[in-house]
Amino acid sequence: MKVGARYKGLGSPQDVQEALSQALYIASKDLATAIYLAMALGKPLLLEGAPGVGKTEAAKALSSTLSCELIRLQCYEGIDANTALYEWNFPRQILAMRQANDAKLNIYDPEFLIARPLLQALHLQSEGLLLIDEIDRADHEFEAFLLEFLSDFQITIPERGRIRASQRPFVILTSNRTRDLHEALRRRCVYHWIDYPSPSLEVDIVLSRASNVARATAEAIVAAVGRLRAEPLAKAPGVAETVEWADAATRLKDLGETWPEAFRRSIGVVLKEQDDLSFLEPRMREIIG
């Protein structure tokens, strides 16, 4: 199936790149190609990279581009299949039993079923995007379950029977690579590593998201963030922090601050650990430039 047959208007990597830019997401050619190929091949897309490089935002921008529903499953330590699939609304079931005059009441009717993200994805009747965010935070058991789910796109609820997807969503998984994912899951996906953007690309991102920022300011902020990322920080600043720092510094400059002072006084937008601030304080002027 050609991509355009299902994802109208996205018939090439360039189409993907241009469409994402309309959603204010500046994607590299390599990322746009990975998205295009995952769509063309009907495979999930696995995005790995450091926190803050734009993995989740890529999924959000793509759903906006496709004008489709975004279903997000946020993974965390201890998540299990029941949490991701469904649960029964026990309080409502009990209340219904107390109030029912009909002996034929079925407490396992769909009205008592609380659909969690994966079941919501199975119920899609039109195009959708399933985002499985930070899969590396889940354990290997949940990862194995997820692999099976992505293979069949169906589940069996003992009280309701088998439920199969009538419209498979496009799937994006993200990982911060805090642990290695199982090779079987990787094989099922189109893989792409998102690195921090090049300075020129990051400047374009800042200008697209913060309309009040001048190009010279964006370039200075991006250069400073690049120096920060080269330091052994507890948390390196992501792209979102770059945009916010440029915006914040510009607002202070508009209130009469000098540029060096505006950069310094807004540093809390980009550095959010006291240890990092203390470590860099003696060299802050050098960092800011």
Language-model-detected regions and their locations in the chain:
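C-terminal regulatory/interaction module of P-loop NTP-utilizing enzymes
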Residues: 1-289
